[in-house]
């Protein structure tokens, strides 16, 4: 096999290393979303795992639990959109 094969193999190894580094950094990244003027806050990492949830007691009404549910969904969506935006920039710089 010629030098073309060796070059491609080396490029593949570099790409694999870049991918592994990017994947490892995703767990360290944090994205926050808030809803209801900060009544609910959700923080996720770059793998979309929830890291923390904060709920202000003033929005906890046992008569209307759907309010907190809606705020949580909105806060999570905001955090995920921030993550997706950064991920698209990161992917644009990758050769694959």
Curated annotation (Swiss-Prot):
Its main location: cytoplasm. GO terms for molecular function: DNA binding. The keyword DNA-binding applies. Keywords: Cytoplasm, DNA-binding. It is found in: Cytoplasm, Nucleoid. One of its GO terms (cellular component) is bacterial nucleoid. SUPFAM superfamilies: YbaB-like. InterPro entries: YbaB-like_sf, YbaB/EbfC. The keyword Cytoplasm applies. Binds to DNA and alters its conformation. May be involved in regulation of gene expression, nucleoid organization and DNA protection. Belongs to the YbaB/EbfC family. HAMAP family: DNA_YbaB_EbfC. Homodimer. This is Nucleoid-associated protein CCA_00330. It comes from Chlamydia caviae (strain ATCC VR-813 / DSM 19441 / 03DC25 / GPIC) (Chlamydophila caviae).
